[in-house]
Amino acid sequence: MSAEKISISLPKELYRELEDFITRKGIPDRSKIFQIALRNYLDENREGTEIIYGIINLVYDHEEASEALTEIQHEYKDNIISTLHLHVNERLCIEAIAVKGEKSKLVELNNRLGQIRGILKARLLISFPYEKT
């Protein structure tokens, strides 16, 4: 793979944190960290009508959120591929929802889920591949 070289400036504290991380993890290639971070940033901020795949990660109190969560998931049944549900303790659950659709629709779904009472975390993680619509 051909590559372009660039130079960046970091605040000293961020640089120290990066160097400490690289040392602790034994990472031999600093460039790889920046490539992954940049790819994630570009994916999350991409505009357009591509069909994307992703995971919506939820942490929630099932006593407060389950009913509304199920209702919204049924509204987006065409975008939800699969779900994985884990019990953390008596009240808290983690749910990973595999999704596919236009980014705007998946962001809308994530935002609606995040507004449910009892949802402690709702995050859309965008994955590959992209399909042109």
UniProtKB/Swiss-Prot annotation:
Lineage: superkingdom: Archaea
Per the UniProt entry, what are the Gene Ontology biological process annotations, in alphabetical order?
A: response to nickel cation
Keywords (alphabetical) are:
DNA-binding, Metal-binding, Nickel, Transcription, Transcription regulation
Q: Which cofactor does it need?
A: Ni(2+)
**One of the Pfam families matching this protein, by short name:** RHH_1
MF GO annotations: DNA binding; DNA-binding transcription factor activity; nickel cation binding
Co-factor binding comment: Binds 1 nickel ion per subunit.
Residues binding Ni(2+), per UniProt: 74, 85, 87, 93
InterPro entries membership = Acetolactate_synth/TF_NikR_C (IPR027271), ACT-like_dom_sf (IPR045865), Arc_rbn_hlx_hlx (IPR013321), CopG (IPR002145), CopG/NikR_regulator (IPR050192), Ni_resp_reg_NikR (IPR022988), Ribbon_hlx_hlx (IPR010985), TF_NikR_Ni-bd_C (IPR014864)
**Role summary:** Transcriptional regulator.
Q: Return the similarity comment.
A: Belongs to the transcriptional regulatory CopG/NikR family.
What this protein is called in its record is: Putative nickel-responsive regulator
